[in-house]
Amino acid sequence: MALSKFQLVALLITYTLLFSCQSKIVKRMQVGPSECVYRGRCRDSYECRSRCGPPEFSHETLGLCMFDYDDYEYFCCCTTNY
């Protein structure tokens, strides 16, 4: 079964997006506690976007909701090391 040019382009774009997302997830998992500036509790990383943004942080700052094994709670981690 031959694919059309449109299907090939769509497949290539999908593959590229999936690959880049997986790379970002791997980098997020490598963030250590010493690389974070903590900004309160959270339920998901979406909550941390506003807490880790301007004016206090640059646009390159990533807000992650990370589990703290000492307190058994999730906290916002603001980091530029990703």
From Swiss-Prot:
**InterPro entries assigned to the protein according to its UniProt record, in alphabetical order:** DEFL
**Keyword line:** Antimicrobial, Disulfide bond, Fungicide, Plant defense, Secreted, Signal
Where is the protein localized?
Secreted
Give the UniProt entry's GO cellular component terms: extracellular region
Q: Name one GO biological process term.
A: killing of cells of another organism
User: What cystine pairs are annotated?
Assistant: C36-C78, C42-C65, C48-C76, C52-C77
Q: What are the boundaries of the signal sequence?
A: 1-23
Major subcellular site: secreted
Which family, according to UniProt? Answer: Belongs to the DEFL family.
Protein name (database record): Defensin-like protein 275
Q: Which organism is it from?
A: Arabidopsis thaliana (Mouse-ear cress)
